[in-house]
Curated annotation (Swiss-Prot):
CDD domains, alphabetized: neurotoxins_LC_scorpion (cd23106)
GO molecular function: sodium channel inhibitor activity; toxin activity
Keywords: Antibiotic, Antimicrobial, Disulfide bond, Ion channel impairing toxin, Neurotoxin, Secreted, Toxin, Voltage-gated sodium channel impairing toxin
Tissue: Expressed by the venom gland.
Pfam families: Toxin_3 (PF00537)
The organism of origin for this protein: Tityus discrepans (Venezuelan scorpion)
Protein name: Bactridin-1
S-S bridge residues: C11-C61, C15-C37, C23-C42, C27-C44
UniProt comment concerning the protein's domains: Has the structural arrangement of an alpha-helix connected to antiparallel beta-sheets by disulfide bonds (CS-alpha/beta).
Amino acid sequence: KDGYIIEHRGCKYSCFFGTNSWCNTECTLKKGSSGYCAWPACWCYGLPDNVKIFDSNNLKC
């Protein structure tokens, strides 16, 4: 699945322009195929179904 990865509180991983390699690393550490900085947060491709991603219906941050 594709989406914004979240940290333990349910907030998106924040990023800034130019941090594509950092986001890609974070995404691949979560077993995704790749990722990039879709400012203001990291967007990942190919994540396993068990990885939690941002849900706009559950705004905690």
